[in-house]
Regions:
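Sec/Tat signal peptide C-region and signal peptidase I cleavage site
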Residues: 15-20
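Structured, acidic catalytic/metal-binding patches in enzyme active sites
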Residues: 25-35, 41-204
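Sec-dependent N-terminal signal peptides
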Residues: 4-14
Length: 204
């Protein structure tokens, strides 16, 4: 069966040139039909898909799409609720209690730059003050992309684009991972102290 598989890449540099090879065709004498692998990046603007040579032919020649997740599963209320709970710090912990005074000041400086407000604002503190460093890292990355990445829209993604294409054409969509696995990898597999270090790397 012809398949389009989306592989997320952690390298922004892959998207600095339309000439970078992001689409691969897999074929061979023992395969009845080819499959395609596309390298994607969550923070790349969806408009970039038009710069990937061969994408229209690949989409028109596939019978199913396989992504990191089935995006429809991710949008279900129960999945959103699970994610929100996983992003919270353990009871009694706050970001302020985890960071030194100097680190907290540096974090506030970045927040002020990105949102024109910091943790001294009750609304900002209520939104960010009790989430894990990893969750805040993700939120800050989105805010940075909104501010600096031309054409970035957090409501659209490569995965969503390809999966919607498949569903419009009545093709199956497969997720490589479950929502629970994503939560485990993103928010539970990294110790809090290491999350803090990664957060401060982003801040600095």
């Amino acid at each position: 069966m012809k398949k389009l598989m989306l592989i997320s890449l952690a390298l922004v540099s892959m998207f600095t040139s339309a000439n970078a090879q992001l689409l691969y065709k897999i074929s061979g004498k023992d395969l009845k039909s080819p499959s395609y692998i596309v390298g994607t990046y969550h923070l790349a603007p969806v408009s970039f898909v038009n710069a990937i040579e061969g994408i229209p032919d690949a989409l028109n020649n596939t019978e199913q799409v396989c992504g990191e997740l089935d995006m429809e599963d991710m949008k279900k209320p129960e999945s959103v609720q699970k994610m929100a709970v996983a992003m919270l710090l353990p009871h009694g912990k706050t970001l302020k209690s985890m960071l030194t005074e100097e680190e907290y000041t540096r974090l506030n400086k970045l927040l002020k730059d990105l949102t024109s407000a910091d943790m001294s604002n009750p609304i900002v503190e209520a939104k960010f003050g009790n989430i894990t460093p990893q969750a805040l890292n993700t939120q800050l990355t989105l805010l940075m992309s909104l501010k600096h990445a031309r054409g970035f829209d957090p409501t659209q993604s490569f995965d969503d684009y390809f999966q919607k294409f498949a569903k419009r054409n009545h093709e199956p969509v497969i997720g490589l991972e479950t929502v629970d696995k994503q939560i485990e990898v993103l928010f539970k597999s990294i110790p809090l102290e290491r999350q803090k270090q990664l957060l401060m790397c982003l801040v600095d």
